Amino acid sequence: ELAKQLLQRKDLDLVVGMGTAAVKALLAVNDGRTPILGMGMADPIAAGVVKSAEDSGVDNFTCRVEVDRWSSMFRVFYDVVRFHKMGIMFQNSQEGRVYAALGDAQAIASELGFTLVLYDGLSSAESTEECRKGLDELHKKGMDAFFIGPLNCFDIGDAGMAPLLQKLNQWKVPTFA
């Protein structure tokens, strides 16, 4: 509803959507009149926000697409750490898998020969307690590295982040985000 109200205004020259959910909300009610700039999206192609790296598919929409962003990051993390089992937590939904860069992680794991240990028990809240439980489960499965995706429980402003990082530190599990 807010996205629709924004795009109906006549006094705006540009609307900026911050994050995948906001951009999807704007595009769902796009009237083609006001330019829309999408920012802060993990993977616009995988999220279905754009058609390709070359063409958004929407005349009044633009965003940056960094091809192979996550694949490159997973490769560098592996090259530096040489782990065997990388843990990933996510919400069991299409969006959750996109935010976790699961497709890229699976491809790189197969290419480089490491295993993914997955925890898909997060709700959309991604609370500290849910993430603590997820980390415990991943640790039991032998995780020796952890990918911190864009999860609420690891948000820099969230008070629950420090105990989660302390837990990973105690286990001597290297991380990257």
Which residues are covered by each model-predicted region?
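Flexible loop/hinge segments that line or gate small-molecule binding clefts
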Residues: 37-67
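An alpha-beta-alpha
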Residues: 61-112
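Short, well-structured alpha-helical segments in soluble
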Residues: 1-14, 25, 130-145
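Venus flytrap/periplasmic-binding-protein-like
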Residues: 35-48, 161-177
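Short beta-strand scaffold positions
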Residues: 16-17, 38, 148
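Short, well-ordered alpha-helical microsegments
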Residues: 22-26, 74
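Short beta-strand elements in bilobed, periplasmic/extracellular small-molecule ligand-binding domains
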Residues: 1, 60, 106-128
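Alpha-helix capping/helix-boundary segments
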Residues: 21-23, 152-153
